[in-house]
Amino acid sequence: METIATRLAILPFPEIDPVIFTIGPLAVRWYGLAYVAGILLGWLYARRIIQNASLWRNGTAPFNLAQLDDFLLWAAGGIVLGGRIGYILFYDLGSILENPVRAIQIWNGGMSFHGGLLGTTLAIIIFARRNAIPLWSLFDVVAAVVPIGLFFGRIANFINGELWGRLSSMPWAVVFPTGGPFARHPSQLYEAALEGIVLLVVLAWFVYRRRALKMPGLVTGIFVCGYAASRIFVEFFREPDAQIGYLAGDWLTMGMVLSLPMALVGIWAIARARSAAAAA
């Protein structure tokens, strides 16, 4: 039976198969393609940043293209392993303990941005120390390109019909196949716009207009604060994970709890970068 919420939804859910094509037993999915596209396009953008001498103090980047290329595999490992482990620890530990095999079934979904961030942070620290690269400069380059991956990842979430929003009567609400016969906020698209497009533009402005890379740590701090603010805002429209629900009342979610410390770290990084620049 058609509901009022269904009639109010004017944005139909696109019937896109999560699987793009198959080659024998191998299924190529939009979600996997989003990760590949995000990493490769981010890598290409990072190369442009490194090659632009005017962006850097002393007219040259503190690491070269070959080192960036070597870091690509480290970044991919940090994203995938950290994202999966983070999801298990933050969102789905109980069911994983009941069925440990699910821990490796990434194709069924279950990745955490906060876990991926921690994994990538660890990869950056180890790689920078092993290769004598200034830690904050590597952080800054990675931070400047991360929104590209966030954009593609959230679009893939939308295509998969997962991580949908709360009930909505807005004219752009969507009835998702797995969300019941109710119109919901397309919160994945909100995140793609804020965490992806808006944050990418803001960071690019600081990199190219304000020459923020000459203040190591500033771009990182802006990214962390920007993501935290965007995520906390969207959490008010996003349905919490069913296995966790709300942590308090009908508003506090795990995404908010994990993002608040990020905002504090971002503020600290910005203050540190400005203080170091003033003392130089």
From Swiss-Prot:
UniProt family annotation: Belongs to the Lgt family.
Regions that span the bilayer: 30-50, 71-91, 106-126, 132-152, 188-208, 217-237, 251-271
Annotated InterPro entries: Lgt (IPR001640)
Gene behind the chain: lgt
Function: Catalyzes the transfer of the diacylglyceryl group from phosphatidylglycerol to the sulfhydryl group of the N-terminal cysteine of a prolipoprotein, the first step in the formation of mature lipoproteins.
GO cellular component: plasma membrane
Top-level taxon of the source organism: Bacteria
Annotated localization: Cell inner membrane
NCBIfam families with a match to the protein in the record: lgt (TIGR00544)
EC number(s) recorded for this UniProt protein: 2.5.1.145
Cited PROSITE patterns: LGT
Coiled coil ranges: none
Membrane topology, as annotated: Multi-pass membrane protein
One MF annotation (Gene Ontology) recorded for this entry: phosphatidylglycerol-prolipoprotein diacylglyceryl transferase activity
Enzyme class: transferase
Pathways per UniProt: Protein modification; lipoprotein biosynthesis (diacylglyceryl transfer)
Keyword annotations of the record: Cell inner membrane, Cell membrane, Membrane, Transferase, Transmembrane, Transmembrane helix
Gene Ontology BP terms: lipoprotein biosynthetic process
Protein name: Phosphatidylglycerol--prolipoprotein diacylglyceryl transferase
Pfam families, per database record: LGT
Binding positions for a 1,2-diacyl-sn-glycero-3-phospho-(1'-sn-glycerol) per the UniProt entry: 154
